[in-house]
Amino acid sequence: SVLGGFLLSNERREKQALREQPRELSQKLGQAIDGIASTSPLTVVDVGAQSLEDEDHVYAPMLAHTKGRVIGFEPLEHRRREREANERNIDLSLRPTLIGDGRSYTFHINNIDATSSLLPFNRDIVDDLNDHRTLETVATETVVTTTLDEAISDVSRVDFLKLDIQGFAYPALANAASVLSRTLVVHCEVEFLPFYLGQALFSDVDPLLRANGFRFVDFSRLSRSAFRSGPPASRDQLGWAEAVYFKEADTITNPSWILIQAFIAVTIYGKLSLARHLIGEYDRRSGTSYESLFDD
């Protein structure tokens, strides 16, 4: 009887509708975007573009519903080859460039290569946390970084900018003012602890993006770890997250860019109220009635 009450409740029906609506809206908005010549294809810039075994690329749902291309930056050659071999079905361009501030650094290649960084580990932090204490650097090489402004100066609009570069997001963003001026959504790994020596934290990245016209929307993922002393299941320390920022609509002059933001909001993040808010602004500027899609 209790189970039946839950399954037949209005609350469950409403939640089921919330799960189904993003798929339908994604398809319809994707078709709308494909129909606007100036917006298609959408452009994803992926800084730190290697594939991870246990998860899809965060922007994969976006590419499933509209025409798009991915420009990726991944310094490890075997990871570039691996992704190119596995993703022949998308418009993918992978580059070996290390994105940063244009200066030379020592690139630290680690035993888990997804943690490789232009910065060395901060052993005082890493050794204290159960999930991180086995990390170590196995090789180093001297590299020269390139700024995002230089690397994609020919890209007229970045619809989705994703950064996962292990403590180096702040220098990359601080030297990307031109790119940020034409970027609609930023999805950025940020840290709350200095896992790497000399790195900036979320408290540094957040005001930088706000100063460039972005609004913090949410964390799409939060990662916590247990202290080495245990117990391992007691994951008490928040270490890092993936932060989501949308360009403030009142700073966007092209209304179709707001339609793209709404598409990303619902397709990648399932944020229906944000999407409807943005669609309302798009309709107001363009004289359309896409907001009615939310009433179906």
Residue ranges and their predicted role:
Residues F6, N10-D296:
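Phosphate/nucleotide-binding beta-alpha loop and adjacent structural elements of enzyme active sites
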Residues S1-G4:
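Long, low-complexity intrinsically disordered regions enriched in Ser/Thr/Asp/Glu with frequent Gly/Pro
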